[in-house]
Design a protein with these regions (language model features):
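Acidic, turn/loop-rich segments in luminal/extracellular domains of secretory-pathway
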Residues: 1-73, 77-88, 92-171, 176-180
């Protein structure tokens, strides 16, 4: 049962020594590693036994990519003119996700901020009108949206969609044959 001292040393392969530290017989990261930022770390370690005999080796630590939830959910537009046709695109969703190739499924969900979910629908990554939206009836429609990736990570956001008032054509005007 020989005692050994272990240390990080400069030399070939020590490029990432500053990101790690040794405590006792264990190696620790100074901060949480992130596969998307840096997938592997190169370090050089020296081991010295009680008799002073030492050896040095270069090591590569390869991180495993773990799927992470999106950090925010956005929509490309939050306003639309009133009385547009059904299935008119209001906006397109985008999930900011550290996993750049992650696919998202968007759905409307109940809860706080879902008061207008029944007037809107989602097709793929697009928010569409499901009825003719009328500024005079309501000038803000609130929808609650869930983005879920293929492993089940979820993020929910509420969007307030402003309905722009459009000058409606006059109606109910009857021409008269008499002038005065």
């Amino acid at each position: 049962n020989d005692n050994h001292s272990i240390s990080l040393v400069p030399g070939d392969g020590s490029e990432d020594n500053d990101a790690l530290l040794i405590g006792g017989q264990k190696l620790y990261f100074k901060s949480n590693p992130d596969f998307e930022a840096k997938p592997n770390y190169s370090l050089r370690i020296r081991v010295v036994d009680a008799g002073g005999i030492s050896t040095e080796n270069k090591f590569i630590i390869n991180l495993i990519d773990i799927n992470e939830a999106g950090t925010s959910l956005e929509i490309s537009a939050q306003q639309i003119d009133e009385n547009v046709d059904l299935n008119t695109v209001v906006g397109q969703f985008k999930t900011n996700d550290p996993d750049t190739n992650d696919q998202q499924v968007y759905t409307l969900v109940s809860g706080k901020g879902a008061s207008s979910n029944n007037l809107i629908l989602i097709s793929g990554d697009k928010l569409l009108t499901n009825t003719q939206l009328n500024h005079k009836a309501n000038d803000i429609y609130s929808v609650r949206t869930l983005a879920e990736d293929l492993v089940g990570n979820k993020i929910v956001s509420v969007f307030d969609i402003k309905i722009n008032d459009v000058n409606d054509a006059p109606s109910g005007i009857q021409p008269s044959s008499s002038l005065q």
